[in-house]
Design a protein with these regions (language model features):
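Bilobed "Venus flytrap"/periplasmic-binding protein-like clamshell domains
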Residues: 93-116, 130, 177-240, 244-249, ...
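Short, positively charged and aromatic/hydrophobic N-terminal segments
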Residues: 23, 42-45, 71, 76, ...
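Cysteine-centered motifs
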Residues: 15-16, 21, 37, 54
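Beta->alpha turn/N-cap motifs
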Residues: 132-134, 143-156, 225-226, 243-249
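Extracytoplasmic small-molecule ligand-binding "clamshell" domains
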Residues: 106-110, 119-151
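Hydrophobic/proline-rich hinge and linker segments of small-molecule sensing/allosteric domains
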Residues: 164-187, 266-285
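Pocket-lining segment of extracytoplasmic ligand-binding domains
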Residues: 225-318
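Secondary-structure end/capping motifs
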Residues: 286-357
Length: 374
């Protein structure tokens, strides 16, 4: 129970003259003091000003503010004229959902409104699980999270447990994961080098196999956390690095050179389609109606950030890892845009083609039938 105690009365002049108090008191009874009227006014104000949108409740009483993701219910009211006003709200615990995403500025931007309680959440609370994409991919194979970001490559291994959400995509539209090195290498040379990769379930790794025309077992690679790939190349652990995230904008600062942009290559080979890198998925344990409600909430969060870009970018800066505001804003714009609000026909086709080619070349075990929340 959440108990709200009435404060001190404003004085006799605060009496409403019965307009508010009348419905709550015997109309034949006179107001004995301002406190009784204050109670009635408080209740009327609460009932008028409570904003309840399926779990979003804001109740204001004077200078005090109550924000609870609860359904409002008045269990009992003290009608004693000289007692403090007592208003009880029965608390209906909102459903808590785990939401996995990477600690990167684009994901932080996307979920700004959820992190700061800026939009209605339709009876849900979101527990943000911040982990690198390879870890999230692995957790998704075990069905551990309610909603999570995954690599599109990983979707091929979790489609029995998760459905794709229509929003939340990260598309490389004329850009994407990059191969960098201390000196320029061409494809035939790279195929013979040791490559530092950010994870075997990342879309970058699948794109690399498609670009090389070889399955992973036929070339040399080492898995390195994505934020340590520069160091791996510079220290000689690997000769080539497959970089994702903001490394695509900062590799020159590390005195490395670009060998290939896999997003550019993919677009040339596939009629200008974007390279599908990541998406959000929802656990199939939820019924269709619940999936849709959650999906709409996540889409609303993305739309809010796009509509309030400056403040959302400021929030995202805390995850920017050595990027200034301008660079972080550029990175966010690369991966949170119209593709993120909805894949659209081209976005869906790019996933079909990406996973279809992977299956035809024996890089994933099953042909995929995409299942989207609608």
């Amino acid at each position: 129970m959440v108990e709200v105690l009435g404060g001190e009365p404003d004085g006799p002049e605060s009496c409403c003259g019965g307009d508010f108090c009348g419905p709550l008191k015997n109309t034949k009874e006179k107001h004995r003091n301002a406190r009784a009227c204050r109670f009635a006014r408080t209740l009327a104000t609460l009932l008028r000003e409570v904003v309840a949108d399926c779990g979003w409740i804001t109740a204001r009483r004077g200078r005090r503010s109550i924000k609870k993701h609860d359904r409002l219910a008045i269990d009992s009211l003290s009608r004693r004229d000289t007692a403090p006003a007592l208003v009880y709200f029965s608390r209906m615990q909102a459903t808590t959902l785990t939401l996995g995403h990477s600690p990167d500025p684009d994901d932080a931007f996307m979920f700004y409104a959820l992190a700061k309680d800026l939009i209605p959440t339709h009876g849900f609370r979101f527990e943000h699980i911040l982990q690198d994409i390879q870890t999230l991919n692995e957790r998704a194979t075990r069905g551990e999270l309610d909603i999570t970001a995954v690599s599109i490559h990983a979707y091929a291994y979790v489609s029995d447990k998760y459905a794709l959400l229509p929003s939340g995509a990260s598309m490389g539209d004329g850009y994407g994961p990059m191969l960098v090195a201390k000196q320029k290498f061409f494809r035939e040379e790279i195929a013979k080098k040791k490559i530092a990769v950010p994870g075997t379930m990342t879309s970058a790794f699948l794109a690399l196999q498609l670009w090389l025309g070889k399955p992973a077992k036929e070339f040399d690679y080492v898995v390195v956390p994505f934020d340590q790939i520069f160091a791996a190349v510079k220290n000689g652990v690997a000769e080539v690095g497959l970089i994702i995230h903001e490394g695509q904008l900062t590799f020159q600062n590390e005195k490395l050179v670009l060998c290939e942009d896999l997003g550019v290559w993919w677009g040339k080979e596939n009629n200008g389609l974007p390279l599908p890198l990541g998406g959000n998925v929802i656990n199939k344990k939820f019924d269709l109606a619940t999936r849709k409600k959650i999906s709409d909430t996540l889409t609303a969060s993305i739309q809010y950030s796009l509509d309030h870009r400056p403040e959302a970018v400021v929030h995202a800066l805390q995850y920017a890892r050595d990027m200034g505001r301008d660079l972080a804003d550029k990175f966010v714009g690369m991966y949170v845009n119209h593709w993120t609000l909805d894949y659209g026909d081209k976005g869906r086709e790019s996933i079909r083609r990406f996973l279809g080619q992977a299956y035809e070349r024996g890089l994933i075990p099953h042909r995929q039938e995409l299942e989207f929340v609608v």
